[in-house]
Design a protein with these regions (language model features):
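Classical eukaryotic N-terminal signal peptides for Sec-dependent ER targeting/secretion
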Residues: 1-8
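Intrinsic low-complexity, intrinsically disordered or marginally ordered coil/linker segments
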Residues: 5, 15-140
């Protein structure tokens, strides 16, 4: 998994050398989470403003944040607000939250957000299985 700052540098590089990006969802990482411990996460939907059938689900989670809302604000500040020309064709909506726990080779998805409600844990598990194929991912 790449450090967050490398992802931002990559996006900046794309902006400078490629101009406006029409299909951002193809290279925006589905899952950016810590890979240890027990932490809060949010499930978001990224939708193209001109084509509602063009969408992607994103998971963001970290030990750094005590509140689901701060995860969302961090994502917006470090991505959308930092590069408004790149993200101007997309809307981002939080679909819910919960917790992710790494326990050995198991990833456990559970809980809910007080602000955003419970995320679709089955969808979250499917995205995590793609990102971590050697782990046993389960929903409680």
């Amino acid at each position: 998994m790449f450090p967050k700052y490398l992802i931002l540098i990559f996006i900046y590089f794309i902006i400078i050398y490629c101009g406006e990006i029409k299909n951002l969802k193809d290279f925006l990482t589905d899952v950016i989470i810590d890979t240890h411990g027990d932490f809060k996460y949010i499930l978001m939907e990224m939708v193209n403003k001109t084509n509602m059938n063009d969408y992607k689900y994103l998971i963001r989670g970290s030990n750094e944040f005590d509140y689901h809302k701060r995860l969302y604000f961090n994502f917006m500040q470090n991505s959308v607000y930092k590069f408004p020309d790149v993200y101007k064709n997309f809307n981002f909506k939080v679909l819910g939250g919960g917790r992710i726990a790494f326990k050995g080779k198991d990833i456990i998805v559970y809980g809910e957000s007080g602000v955003y409600g419970k995320a679709n844990h089955k969808l979250t598990c499917n995205l995590l299985k793609k990102q971590f194929p050697s782990f046993n991912v389960k929903d409680l």
